[in-house]
Amino acid sequence: MKKNLIIGIICYVITGVLTILFLATSVSVKLIMPELEKVIVLCVASIFTYFGGRFLTKYHNSKKYMKISIWVMFILYLLLLINFIVLGNNFGRNFEFIFTASKDTIKSYFDNNYNIIPFNTIKNYLDNSGIYFDIKLVCINLLGNLLCFMPFAFFLKYLFKRENKFINFLLTIVLIVIFFELIQLLTLSGSFDVDDIILNTLGAILFYLFISLKGIDKLLKNIFFLEKNKINGKD
């Protein structure tokens, strides 16, 4: 039915509009949007992307549109991650600093914004929470680092067959996390912290193991790839 085609296209158009809004508020100094609202915008965009894929799948009788939708969601997630890690002013990021800082300032920044001692930052947070650090901010920081790379588990597992082997996924996610940590340091928008690498990687691993459970795996394939797997109590 043409109705499915029209609705599918409308969903994708709405996704495009919301993505443009997100990008505009991320790079413009005049258009400012709180980080939570940016998350909501891209979550809504992802929902429209999903249903766009479903309606186009019904119209064309081809599941490839669902995979396209998952790829679009992956791109939206990457945009959100880049915003938080490099561009997010609400998180103390100052990407423009790299263009105005002197060589001495840059050298000093590199010298003072890295930690290669495992659990040093985490221990510092826990020991000084409520004294030098707000407990709420400590929880947000630690929990945020644990959660923010979890979606990679889903996207890597279901978009790349190679990542269905745990050892391949582990190597990939470690490299990705290290890459983002280096980007923060090299753009002067954050620090390189081995504790962030530990938390980011741990979160992704835990979620990967969770979605690899037989019943959860079948459920996700039914939802996102429109498979018709039977799920029983033993799964």
Task: Please provide the spans of the model-predicted regions.
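Bulky hydrophobic segments
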Residues: 1-188, 208-235
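Alpha-helical transmembrane segments of multi-pass membrane proteins
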Residues: 146, 150, 197-204
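Active-site scaffold segments
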Residues: 181-184, 196, 200
